[in-house]
A protein has these predicted regions:
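Non-catalytic accessory regions
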Residues: 1-138, 158-162, 178
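Generalized protein targeting/export and membrane-interface segments
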Residues: 118-204
């Protein structure tokens, strides 16, 4: 979800175009984030140390993480943490964004911070978005007096992610008296709470 929201922000601010964004999303499917990028993003390594390890890789038959531990730059525990984040969508998006556009990581970091401020998120909320934590993301968009609204929204998003696609994002919740749509699929639920849950399409 971060990729879609941040990508939309970059397009609206003329940093990238829609063609580049589509290219980034396609390449993300075949990408695992590089350990060096993750280590720098997490503040575990400086950019200079990561580049030094990259140079050492050309001289040794060893992986980035193994060299970093061998040189004493990171611990084995830190390496395990970095490895667990290689499939993180945020890390993959940042890496492919840099590869496709040539924008340096320091500048990308500034765009991320500008994006956070523009959407009004706290640093903690931004981290939830980066980590695709749906249970924490939904309340950031869905301000509702009834807690079941956010629970239903979170359930719907989890199922979209599991069974349909990860290529989507949500916007702020809206209370409306009418809604125009081209197609609608839903179901009425009756019980302790009577409600209609559905998906509507406005256009093609």
């Amino acid at each position: 979800m971060f990729s879609q929201l941040f990508g939309k922000y970059l397009i609206e601010n003329d940093v990238i175009n829609e063609g580049q964004f589509d290219d980034i999303l396609a390449k993300m499917e075949q990408t695992r984030a590089k350990l060096g990028l993750i280590a720098v993003s997490e503040g575990i390594l400086t950019k200079e140390k990561a580049e030094e390890i990259n140079i050492l890789q050309t001289q040794k038959d060893a992986r980035f993480g193994d060299i970093a531990v061998e040189e004493g730059y990171i611990t084995k525990e830190q390496l395990d943490t970095l490895l667990s984040k290689q499939g993180n969508p945020y890390m993959k998006f940042i890496q492919v964004l840099e590869e496709v556009t040539g924008i340096e990581q320091s500048k990308i970091d500034k765009y991320v911070e500008d994006f956070r401020k523009s959407i009004g998120f706290t640093p903690e909320e931004l981290e939830s978005l980066k980590n695709e934590d749906i249970d924490k993301i939904v309340p950031m968009f869905a301000y509702a007096s009834n807690p079941y609204v956010t629970r239903i929204a979170a359930l719907a998003l989890r199922n979209i992610t599991r069974f349909v696609t990860t290529n989507y994002y949500i916007g702020k919740i809206e209370h409306v008296s009418s809604f125009d749509y081209r197609a609608f699929a839903g179901q009425r639920c009756e019980g302790a709470i009577n409600t209609v849950i559905g998906f509507a399409v406005k256009n093609d």
